[in-house]
């Protein structure tokens, strides 16, 4: 069975495959994960106001066009003292989508005067599985999902354009995962992406501490952890693992 991961980032596809394979066990051999990018599908416009809504929008956009089950995630950083910002705006907090250094610099400036014990935060991920109804037929719903939310992509002129739906939606599942921790004052580590170099998770791998100059013995940031260490505690890992029963149900 093919399942489409709603991403154009092949690195994320590899990460999601690794996480799911750990829990699917032998069932993993019966699933082929492919990216939306490899199928040349456009990115939908993320018009949701929560991580759950955006994850569902991305998965719906793939499922209603391809007739294949689709997995999508939406995640971001929630900083308590900032009223849960950056939230769904995490990737474009400084204005440019995916500009990690600018986003990190702005975040540090905004909480510069906040004492260490008040810099609590958490990464949150919503992971969605959308299963299309391939028995209903083609050209249904005109891009409108079961709850009335229209899925859009971006037209050539930059305006929103409804995604043409070839299939209705049979079922939807969405799960949440959190990774609590705190924001430090300077970046550490070379792994990961986004805010990982600034984030120290509460859960730490046994027997491992930072070896960075001036920070020896301190807890690791997400960017100092190996991919396996991070996946074991990460928000994305928790949300995707919670989807496994719904994915397994497609196979049996």
From Swiss-Prot:
PANTHER family recorded: INOSINE TRIPHOSPHATE PYROPHOSPHATASE, INOSINE TRIPHOSPHATE PYROPHOSPHATASE/HAM1 PROTEIN
Gene Ontology cellular component annotations, sorted alphabetically: cytosol
Sequence segments annotated as region (Disordered): 202-229
Cofactor: Mg(2+)
Record-listed substrate binding positions: 7-12, 75, 193-196, 230, 235-236
Keywords assigned by UniProt, alphabetized: Hydrolase, Magnesium, Metal-binding, Nucleotide metabolism, Nucleotide-binding
Gene Ontology MF: a single term: XTP diphosphatase activity
One Pfam family hit: Ham1p_like
InterPro entries the UniProt entry points to: dITP/XTP_pyrophosphatase (IPR020922), ITPase-like_fam (IPR029001), RdgB/HAM1 (IPR002637)
Organism: Bifidobacterium longum (strain NCC 2705)
Active-site residue list: 74 (proton acceptor)
Function: Pyrophosphatase that catalyzes the hydrolysis of nucleoside triphosphates to their monophosphate derivatives, with a high preference for the non-canonical purine nucleotides XTP (xanthosine triphosphate), dITP (deoxyinosine triphosphate) and ITP. Seems to function as a house-cleaning enzyme that removes non-canonical purine nucleotides from the nucleotide pool, thus preventing their incorporation into DNA/RNA and avoiding chromosomal lesions.
Record note on quaternary structure: Homodimer.
Amino-acid positions noted as binding Mg(2+) in the UniProt annotation, renumbered to this chain: 74
Protein name: dITP/XTP pyrophosphatase
Catalytic class of the enzyme: hydrolase
SUPFAM superfamilies assigned to the protein according to its UniProt record, in alphabetical order: ITPase-like
Catalytic activity annotation: XTP + H2O = XMP + diphosphate + H(+); dITP + H2O = dIMP + diphosphate + H(+); ITP + H2O = IMP + diphosphate + H(+)
Cofactor comment text: Binds 1 Mg(2+) ion per subunit.
Family label: Belongs to the HAM1 NTPase family.
Record-level GO BP terms: nucleotide metabolic process; purine nucleoside triphosphate catabolic process
EC number(s) on file: 3.6.1.66
């Amino acid at each position: 069975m093919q399942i489409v991961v709603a991403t154009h980032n092949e690195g994320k596809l590899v990460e999601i495959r690794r996480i799911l394979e750990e829990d699917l066990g032998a069932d993993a051999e019966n699933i082929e994960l492919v990216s939306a990018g490899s199928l040349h599908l456009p990115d939908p416009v993320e018009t949701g106001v929560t991580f759950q809504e955006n994850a569902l929008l991305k998965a719906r956009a793939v499922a209603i066009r391809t007739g294949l089950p689709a997995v999508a995630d939406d995640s971001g950083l929630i900083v308590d003292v900032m009223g849960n910002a950056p939230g769904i705006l995490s990737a474009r907090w400084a204005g440019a989508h995916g500009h990690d250094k600018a986003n990190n610099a702005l975040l540090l400036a905004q909480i510069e005067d906040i004492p260490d014990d008040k810099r609590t935060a958490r990464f949150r991920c919503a992971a969605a599985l959308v299963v299309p109804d391939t028995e209903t037929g083609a050209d249904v719903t005109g891009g409108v999902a079961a709850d009335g939310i229209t899925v859009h992509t971006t037209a050539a002129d930059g305006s929103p354009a409804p995604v043409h739906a070839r299939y209705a939606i049979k079922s939807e599942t969405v799960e949440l995962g959190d990774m609590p921790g705190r924001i430090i004052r300077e970046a550490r580590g070379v792994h990961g992406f986004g805010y990982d170099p600034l984030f120290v998770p509460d859960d730490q791998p046994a027997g491992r501490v930072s070896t960075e100059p001036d920070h020896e013995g301190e807890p690791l940031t997400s960017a100092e952890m190996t991919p396996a260490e991070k996946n074991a505690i990460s928000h994305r890992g928790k949300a995707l693992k919670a989807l496994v029963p719904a994915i397994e149900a497609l196979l049996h």
